[in-house]
Amino acid sequence: MNEKVLVFDMDGTIANLYGVDGWLESLRAYDSSPYEKAMPLYDMDMFNSILHIIKSKGWRIVVTSWLSKGSTPIYDKAVRKAKREWLKKWGVPYDEIHLVKYGTPKHRVTKYPFQVLVDDNEEVRNAWHGRTIDANKNIIHELIKIVTDEF
């Protein structure tokens, strides 16, 4: 049986980075704190409960997210740390994480036979080589379909 993988973006998908006051100015100033300050876009108790059920059905949970557009080795390290800490703080049960250079084609990062991408970026979803879930809509409904085997 092929492994089933659910791949999540972070910013604008599960973390409300764009809701942090001054987020863009901060990132342009090589300040990673907006990644730490971002609030979840969903009730995380419900979200994480659904992910645990999905995992119990044999799915792997992968986070694939871009680093900031502005980049230095030290800043990239701070962004990686902030994103990992955000996932830990909110208890997201992931199996694998890929924090990659801004603009990296996400369809080249994970290579599983059956994988579903959850992302807010239409261009990224269009380049994906499998099923996608539009994170601009309520993803909880789509995740419940996976839980009930209706996906």
Predicted region positions:
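Alpha-helical substrate-recognition element adjacent to the catalytic core
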Residues: 5-89, 94
